[in-house]
């Protein structure tokens, strides 16, 4: 059974609570943790487009939020960026 959802993931907490040199890696981790929590699965695969969006303006200027489309197939969760 396939389940599909659209989420807006806030990254403002990552910006406020992280040093500038660690924001992008922590944002990627925050996205993965958000999807694990909301989709109730441990296996989360992020599309390269999400990575490019977070790293687009370098290490320390991450976006405030990211909109993703999430598809759950069995136990695997796959996320892609919505433009």
Swiss-Prot record:
GO CC, sorted alphabetically, is: cytosolic large ribosomal subunit
Give the GO terms filed under biological process for this record.
Answer: cytoplasmic translation
InterPro entries according to UniProt:
Ribosomal_eL31, Ribosomal_eL31_CS, Ribosomal_eL31_dom_sf
Q: Name one GO molecular function term.
A: structural constituent of ribosome
Q: Does the keyword Transmembrane helix apply?
A: no
Family matches, as Pfam families: Ribosomal_L31e
Q: Which UniProt keywords apply?
A: Ribonucleoprotein, Ribosomal protein
Instruction: Return the HAMAP family for the record.
Output: Ribosomal_eL31
Family assignment? Belongs to the eukaryotic ribosomal protein eL31 family.
Q: What is this protein called?
A: Large ribosomal subunit protein eL31
Q: Which gene encodes it?
A: rpl31e
């Amino acid at each position: 059974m396939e389940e599909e959802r659209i989420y807006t993931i806030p990254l403002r907490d990552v910006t406020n609570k992280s040093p500038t040199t660690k924001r992008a890696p922590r944002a990627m981790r925050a996205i993965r943790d958000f999807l694990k929590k909301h989709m109730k699965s441990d296996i989360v695969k992020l599309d390269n487009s999400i990575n490019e969006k977070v790293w687009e303006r370098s290490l320390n200027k991450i976006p405030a939020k990211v909109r993703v489309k999430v598809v759950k197939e069995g136990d695997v969760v796959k996320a892609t960026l919505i433009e």
